[in-house]
């Protein structure tokens, strides 16, 4: 029994920022039964001249057509392609083609099934690997009132969850958190959990004394063409976070310049490495940064910069320069010792 009733889903427009590749994992939508981010990991390897293709988890409705040829190349070229085709019965055949040299491997992540099919298939596959069997068919319905709890699992705490969201810009998890917030505080007037979350966030902002007339929330993530916020409003939110008793947990969730997350390769060879905790934002026509950055004198600044352009080539370098210029504040003269 697959119970997806915890979340009341909103009806939102698609954000097609994917180059028309609907199978990219970062486009996975939130769901009450979200399991493993609905991702399938395909691994192809050349093992002593024999090409093997596997999928994790090994869901029965995913079939593999292995057409990869053995290559005599001396280097691993990564010339492997994965082409999924969905059949009328909902099963998916993934044709894997290309060439792979001895000792080489290739992998990719795809999202190919709906939430219910993926969850049921993953549970059945894992249970079978453990030596068990599940009889009967899968149905979507509320959990029967007379059902007995056999096992219970708890999510990581919020500090750990937002670390994954912010470090790696995980839109699916951000939307899931947004809807979970709505589900927790939903009332009859909200209609769906996105509207409930929007109301709760605005109430929190008002409580903190933050006015946000330009703020538009849709799904709670960066994967939206409707969401809006001004740089000043975002900076005020960061200042509120700085004053929070949970400031340390929040700041540590942000990517560190030149060190990890989406900032791992940026500012790596500059004096800014390790001096900023900054969340990045990227859409086809938008580049942004927001977070906390230190200057040459050890002062910490709330920093927000948003660039909108139809051709944002080089925009990330411009944003990096903002952080560098802020860091290069003139050195303050040392204060005279007090006797």
Predicted regions and their residues:
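Conserved serine DD-peptidase/penicillin-binding transpeptidase domain
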Residues: 1-212, 296, 328-331, 335-339
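Small-residue-rich helix-loop
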Residues: 168, 178-339
């Amino acid at each position: 029994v697959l119970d997806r009733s915890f979340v009341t889903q909103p009806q939102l427009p698609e954000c097609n920022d994917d180059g028309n590749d609907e199978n990219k994992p970062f486009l996975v939508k939130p769901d009450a039964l979200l399991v493993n981010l609905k991702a399938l990991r395909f691994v192809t390897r050349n093992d002593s001249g024999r090409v093997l293709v596997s999928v994790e988890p090994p869901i029965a409705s995913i079939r593999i057509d292995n057409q990869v040829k053995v290559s005599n190349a001396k280097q691993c070229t990564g010339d492997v392609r994965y082409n999924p085709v969905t059949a009328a019965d909902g099963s998916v055949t993934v044709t894997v083609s290309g060439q792979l040299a001895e000792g080489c491997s290739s992998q990719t992540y795809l999202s190919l099934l709906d939430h219910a099919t993926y969850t049921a298939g993953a549970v059945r596959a894992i249970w079978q690997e453990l030596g068990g069997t599940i009889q009967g068919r899968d149905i979507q319905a509320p959990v029967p009132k007379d059902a007995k709890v056999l096992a219970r699992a708890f999510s990581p705490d919020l500090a750990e969850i937002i670390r994954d969201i912010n470090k790696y810009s995980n839109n699916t998890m951000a939307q899931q958190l947004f809807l979970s917030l709505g589900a927790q505080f939903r009332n009859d007037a909200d209609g769906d959990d996105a509207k409930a979350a929007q109301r709760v966030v605005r109430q929190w902002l008002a409580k903190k004394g933050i006015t946000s007339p330009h703020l538009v929330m849709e799904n709670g993530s960066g994967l939206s063409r409707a969401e809006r916020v001004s740089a000043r409003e975002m900076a005020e939110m960061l200042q509120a976070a700085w004053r929070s008793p949970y400031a340390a947990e929040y700041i540590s969730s942000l990517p560190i310049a030149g060190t990890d997350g989406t900032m791992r390769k940026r500012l790596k060879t500059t004096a800014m490495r390790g001096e900023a905790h900054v969340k990045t934002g990227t859409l086809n026509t938008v580049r942004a940064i927001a977070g906390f950055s230190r200057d040459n004198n050890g002062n910490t600044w709330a920093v927000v910069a948003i660039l909108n352009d139809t051709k944002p080539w080089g925009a990330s370098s411009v944003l990096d320069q903002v952080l560098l210029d802020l860091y290069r504040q003139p050195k303050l003269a040392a204060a005279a010792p007090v006797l």
